[in-house]
Amino acid sequence: MATIQSETDCYDIIEVLGKGTFGEVAKGWRRSTGEMVAIKILKNDAYRSRIIKNELKLLRCVRGLDPDEAHVIRFLEFFHDALKFYLVFELLEQNLFEFQKENNFAPLPARHIRTVTLQVLRALARLKELAIIHADLKPENIMLVDQTRCPFRVKVIDFGSASIFSEVRYVKEPYIQSRFYRAPEILLGLPFCEKVDVWSLGCVMAELHLGWPLYPGNNEYDQVRYICETQGLPKPHLLHAARKAHHFFKRNPHPDATNPWQLKSSADYLAETKVRPLERRKYMLKSLDQIETVNGGGAVNRLSFPDREALAEHADLKSMVELIKRMLTWESHERISPSAALRHPFVSMQQLRSAHEATRYYQLSLRGCRLSLQVDGKPPPPVIANAEDGPPYYRLAEEEETAGLGGVTGSGSFFREDKAPGMQRAIDQLDDLSLQEARRGLWSDTRADMVSDMLAPLKVATTSHRVPDSGPEPILAFYGSRLTGRHKARKAPAGSKSDSNFSNLIRLSQASPEDAGSCRGSGWEEGEGHTTSTEPSAIPQREGDGPSIKDRPMDAERSGPELFDPSGCPGEWLNEPEWTLEGIRGSRAQGLPARHPHPHGPPRTTSFLQHVGGHH
């Protein structure tokens, strides 16, 4: 076990936590206090010396903040020797990427995404007060503090790429931000400000919900292409001012076009750069609104009678997507600021409280935010933001102290009838998705007792009140590991293509497929996932769609209609002489009155007609 020593303290190196481009991070024991710390170790050379000087300058600026209230990592000290630089920080548990990896990149529920977003926005608001741009916000740089004691309490780390705004605003082409989270103004070469971090946070929020990066471009062209295909082209005045516009766009040859610019095709980019564009997205979205429909987000629209918990979660997801749309805008001046985002209904929970206060989902969401903001030895700060106040700080809901997780207050709240807003809009979004996949289930956090009761009503409603699906569900555009980088094209499941021959339809008065000699196991017989055509059916069959009567055996012979034989009936009344053919003819020949079905003789209408006919 190695030991390193500064002027004031001594550290025992326990293990190496990770290695990166510029150095490694080790876990150490601080002898003076007995606490575990994280030590960032870099080689002592001229290049890394410039990086260290920049990070130290930013860390000294951030040192004036309360790291717990500002949600930034606590910096302890810096020292060096002839070979290496050492930066000592508080030890945190793991970053969001590692947390996603442990959970197989399962989608994170909206209420946990809000808990993370709230804290990162508070950090960005504090950094803005110091005129600091973090410039490298991503899941790897958002650390979970202690997931067991304080679920989803996070802090922002790594100020190695951070900059003072006044020092970088005039840099022509700064190479900042990881590509997946790089703002359009950096990609296009436009003036930028601290709102580049807001774009990155919007991408992180979408990634936590999707379980996959929203825009995982292999290069800057792919990055711009992904954004254009989901959000449309930037406005012409942006491209006119962008220094790098010609790298990704070209002039529109049609003079009457509404936009004088158009995105270069993949073939154009390949011809110019000899670099083949790649498709690395998991979901090919036609708009940011379609984020709402991914990973079970549209399930409530397929319930005939969704319960209150499902409605609350669905409304929360819609509110989250609205905030993401405000964060991911082409123009930075239209992008929401950190302080304004803290007052957004999704973060402040005002909309959730007003419409779904009586639900357990709201109570769990409120408690999750309070736990994430609570600092040891201090009372938890209020969560719900005052929308009328300018500063991004908070006031507590009046009923918060009386509303516990075991029960909720408010007598009339349970009897309000809520309706899922915008159901038809969500259905239309589902129909617009270009690719689809079976829905992945939501997963709970490490404290399963906090979410099991909330998810149970949704499962019951989903199984007991199901109506026909409103539209297709999204699938993987590419399927592979985020770590290995190997991507495999996923085959389209049954039901994703239409049957152009309509051979799976059975017309009335025609024989069924087995009568025509089809083999056992056909789609018509099994009822789900198979058809008699070589292509799958356009309408996926669900449980209960097949015939409810037991199928006729395959070897049964179809016969024509049989004549009725009255002699086979067990009763004797049909064999009486009056009902035989000879008896009927004989009764007519003898002029006997016809038998009437009425027990008391012919009806009065018949007697009247016979009377009138006798006079004529």
UniProtKB/Swiss-Prot annotation:
Post-translational modification: Autophosphorylated.
Family annotation (Gene3D superfamilies): Phosphorylase Kinase, domain 1, Transferase(Phosphotransferase) domain 1
Reaction catalysis annotation: L-seryl-[protein] + ATP = O-phospho-L-seryl-[protein] + ADP + H(+); L-threonyl-[protein] + ATP = O-phospho-L-threonyl-[protein] + ADP + H(+)
Subcellular location: Cytoplasm
Binding-site residues, ATP: L17, G18, K19, G20, T21, F22, G23, E24, V25, K40
Region entry Disordered, spans: 487-616
Bias (Polar residues) ranges: 497-512
UniProt enzyme class: transferase
Listed GO MF terms: ATP binding; histone kinase activity; protein kinase activity; protein serine kinase activity; protein serine/threonine kinase activity; protein tyrosine kinase activity
List of catalytic residues: D136 (proton acceptor)
Modified residues (Phosphoserine): S512
Gene Ontology cellular component list: cytoplasm; nucleus
This enzyme's EC code(s): 2.7.11.1
Stored SUPFAM superfamilies: Protein kinase-like (PK-like)
Gene Ontology annotations of biological process type: regulation of signal transduction by p53 class mediator
Protein kinase domain mapped to chain residues: 11-347
Compositionally biased residues, Basic and acidic residues: 542-560
Annotated keywords: ATP-binding, Cytoplasm, Kinase, Nucleotide-binding, Phosphoprotein, Serine/threonine-protein kinase, Transferase
Family: Belongs to the protein kinase superfamily. CMGC Ser/Thr protein kinase family. HIPK subfamily.
Function: Protein kinase that phosphorylates TP53, and thus induces TP53 repression of BIRC5 promoter. May act as a corepressor of transcription factors (Potential).
Name of the protein in its database record: Homeodomain-interacting protein kinase 4
Organismal lineage: Eukaryota, Metazoa, Chordata, Craniata, Vertebrata
